[in-house]
Every structure is written in structure tokens, then in C-alpha cells.
């Protein structure tokens, strides 16, 4: 895969340039564009993934299915499809926004900051997973309500963005509706 960049955003969340992804994620990470996607299988189960230990931020924590950064000139939907293929080796369908205006700032225990405008989507996996071990060290298909209970009981075991997204009542209801269709 070619070197990835992040799209930097100004105070009005408008693109203001790009920066190499690993250079962007520091102790003073600038605001940038990202995405988060929750994948469900045909049985309505949610795919939770455990981040590889080689990840710069939040290595080894459980998180929603796939996250990433749209590249300059790429739509968020195109970026989600690209990262699903790269990280999970999976094709998706029915890509649906569930929390389009989510943004957050969080600091990893090692000091790395995430500072993202991060629209959240749900999608349906349509093929068998072929996980990229450089991105994902483990995964599990689980019932959404079971994942929600785990998030409430042990939020420290999950990425902060996953906890924040699921903690938003409207987003949680949309995810629950999505998995039940």
C-alpha cells in the first residue's frame, strides 16, 4: 500500500492540506478527517477487532470493525471500502451513515493524540474475512447488545472512539436498528 496521508481540517472542518499519517499522529496531532465503520454479518452480529500491537495509537485494544482516513480526492465511502479490503480482506454492501457528525479528541496512554472529525458508518460484510495481521491481531463476531454490555463494564479494554460512538444514544439506536434488518 502506498504511503497514507491525512486530510487536515481547519476550525470550520474544511480541508486545509495533507500530512503523512505517521507524522500527523503525535503528542500534538492536528485536526484531521477520519472515518469509523461498524460491520455486521448476515446474522446481524457485529465484528469487533483487536488492534495489532504494532499500531502507533491504542495497540492491542478492541475496537469497532474498521477505521481509517480518506485520502485527498477520495470520498469517505471509497475510503471505507478500501480499508475493509486492506485490513479485513472483506467486501461490503449497504454502507449507511449512523453518526455523520462525530468528532473527538483522545490521548493514548503513550501520549499519542487522536484529533478527528470522524463520521461513523455501518455496513454489511458480504464475503469471508481474510484479516491482515499487521492491522488486526484478533477479531470476534458478537451480538451488538453483548458488545454494548462489555463497553459499559470494561470501557478501558476498547478504543475511546468506539466507547464514545456507542455511548451516543441516537448512534447506538441506529446501529441496533441496522443489525436487526
UniProtKB/Swiss-Prot annotation:
It catalyses: isopentenyl diphosphate = dimethylallyl diphosphate. Binds 1 Mg(2+) ion per subunit. The magnesium ion binds only when substrate is bound. Its EC number is 5.3.3.2. Its cofactor is Mg(2+); Mn(2+). GO terms for molecular function: isopentenyl-diphosphate delta-isomerase activity; metal ion binding. Mg(2+) binds at residue 87. Its main location: cytoplasm. Homodimer. Catalyzes the 1,3-allylic rearrangement of the homoallylic substrate isopentenyl (IPP) to its highly electrophilic allylic isomer, dimethylallyl diphosphate (DMAPP). This is Isopentenyl-diphosphate Delta-isomerase. It comes from Salmonella agona (strain SL483). The gene is idi.
Amino acid at each position: 500500500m502506498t504511503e497514507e496521508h491525512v486530510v487536515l481540517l481547519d476550525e470550520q472542518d474544511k480541508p486545509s492540506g495533507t500530512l503523512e499519517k505517521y507524522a500527523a499522529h503525535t503528542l500534538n496531532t492536528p485536526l484531521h478527517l477520519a472515518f469509523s465503520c461498524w460491520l455486521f454479518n448476515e446474522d446481524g452480529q457485529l465484528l469487533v477487532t483487536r488492534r495489532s500491537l504494532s499500531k502507533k495509537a491504542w495497540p492491542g485494544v478492541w475496537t469497532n470493525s474498521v477505521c481509517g482516513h480518506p485520502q485527498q480526492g477520495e470520498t469517505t465511502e471509497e475510503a471505507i471500502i478500501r480499508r475493509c479490503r486492506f485490513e479485513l480482506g472483506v467486501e461490503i454492501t449497504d454502507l449507511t451513515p449512523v453518526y455523520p457528525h462525530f468528532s473527538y479528541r483522545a490521548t493514548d496512554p503513550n501520549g499519542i493524540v487522536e484529533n478527528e472529525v470522524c463520521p461513523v458508518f455501518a455496513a454489511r460484510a458480504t464475503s469471508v474475512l481474510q484479516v491482515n495481521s499487521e492491522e488486526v491481531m484478533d477479531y470476534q463476531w458478537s451480538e451488538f447488545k453483548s458488545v454494548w454490555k462489555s463497553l459499559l463494564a470494561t470501557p478501558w479494554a476498547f478504543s475511546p472512539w468506539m466507547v464514545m460512538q456507542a455511548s451516543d444514544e441516537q448512534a447506538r439506536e441506529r446501529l441496533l436498528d441496522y443489525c436487526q434488518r
